[in-house]
């Protein structure tokens, strides 16, 4: 049910895990079931370029990928100064409030709207501009990483299952 709202007609997937990986192997069945277009990344070094070329709607990866992404984005965010730093901090803070369904004040709603237009939209564009969700699987995703990615406009789901039976049988929102 979590995937229904994000599955469009012929959704675009970008994959970079080895096809022999049990998680990726299972994801292939989903891609076939939803008649998705599948793009294969040339390499991890070219992943961002491939995302901009393929404009994926759904991307699956293991938690280590999202942990690395979290660290790289934080390095960039930590270099920000002045109003840019304030906007980034508000984007994360208010994004987490929205994620955890906490009520925003009128001022916070206005600031969150500004953050959406100036920060989150720019981040989304860096990931191809069409991303509807990341799906993490093959291990537990750190809640801090998942909530951070969601808060900055990169919707992230936590997939889970048993490798022995099937690596992903369901997804939870972070």
Can you name each region flagged by the protein language model?
Residues 36-37, 131-134, 154:
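Short active-site oxyanion
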């Amino acid at each position: 049910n979590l995937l229904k709202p994000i599955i469009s007609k012929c959704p675009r997937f970008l994959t970079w895990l080895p096809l022999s990986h049990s998680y990726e192997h299972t994801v292939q069945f989903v891609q076939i079931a939803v008649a998705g277009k599948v793009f294969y990344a040339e390499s991890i070094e070219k992943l961002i370029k491939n995302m901009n070329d393929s404009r994926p709607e759904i991307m699956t990866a293991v938690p280590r990928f999202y942990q690395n992404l979290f660290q790289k984005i934080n390095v960039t965010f930590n270099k920000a100064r002045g109003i840019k730093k304030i906007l980034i901090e508000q984007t994360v803070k208010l994004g987490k409030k929205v994620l955890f369904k906490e009520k925003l004040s009128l001022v916070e709603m206005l600031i969150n709207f500004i953050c959406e237009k100036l920060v989150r939209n720019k981040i989304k564009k860096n990931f191809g501009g069409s991303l509807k969700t990341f799906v993490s699987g093959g291990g537990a995703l750190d809640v801090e990483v998942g909530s951070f990615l969601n808060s900055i406009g990169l919707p992230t789901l936590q997939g889970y299952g048993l490798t022995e039976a099937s690596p992903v049988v369901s997804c939870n929102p972070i």
